[in-house]
């Protein structure tokens, strides 16, 4: 689905350039002066390498992003991952995920939304277990808990958690 939307955006861009108009004018006009956006957490260690295993580095990164004006932060609480692997997350990983979310929520308070994206890497049962452990941290959404295109599995997860399920 991502490839289709990317292709559509490219087509709109081409049409806009040919017409000499911004795309928003072609699709009905300007609606907002500014829009809220989120950023993904890319914590780095002292060597400048991305390090997704240290909750303290993730907290540091979250605070820097908030200083830049972001009010929504997306991250994978269950990484490292292998997209479409459909694996069952271990208790150790569940505890680590909860620790990440607890520390980030404590650092940002209610000043920032947390968005979880897990790259479609889990079975429905595993996604449900993770969602239920992370509900206390009040995430705005849980994106692709199971592989995209598995509507029944997404519905199964959505029925067992208060966290809104997203895809895209």
List each model region and its residues.
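N-terminal capping/lid subdomain adjacent to the active-site entrance of alpha/beta enzymes
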Residues: 1-115, 121, 125-128, 132-136, ...
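Short, surface-exposed acidic/glycine-rich loop or hinge patches that mediate macromolecular interfaces
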Residues: 121, 147-148
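Generic hydrophobic alpha-helical scaffold/packing signal
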Residues: 131, 143, 155-158
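A short, conserved beta-to-alpha structural element at the edge of catalytic cores
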Residues: 140-147
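Catalytic alpha/beta core domains of metabolic enzymes, predominantly
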Residues: 149, 153-168
């Amino acid at each position: 689905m991502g490839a289709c939307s990317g292709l559509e955006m490219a087509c709109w861009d081409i049409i806009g350039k040919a017409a000499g108009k911004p795309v928003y004018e072609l699709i009905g006009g300007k609606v907002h002066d500014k829009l809220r956006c989120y950023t993904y957490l890319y914590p780095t260690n002292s060597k400048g390498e991305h390090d997704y295993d240290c909750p303290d580095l993730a907290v540091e990164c979250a605070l820097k992003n908030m200083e830049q004006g972001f009010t929504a932060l997306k991250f994978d609480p269950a990484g490292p991952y292998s997209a479409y692997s459909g694996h069952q997350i271990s208790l150790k990983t569940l505890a680590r995920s909860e620790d990440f979310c607890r520390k980030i929520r404590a650092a940002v308070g209610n000043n920032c939304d947390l968005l979880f994206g897990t790259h479609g890497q889990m079975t429905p049962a595993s996604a449900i277990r993770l969602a239920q452990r992370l509900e206390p941290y009040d995430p705005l959404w849980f994106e692709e808990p199971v592989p995209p295109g598995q509507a029944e599995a997404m519905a199964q997860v959505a029925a067992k958690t208060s966290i809104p399920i997203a895809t895209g």
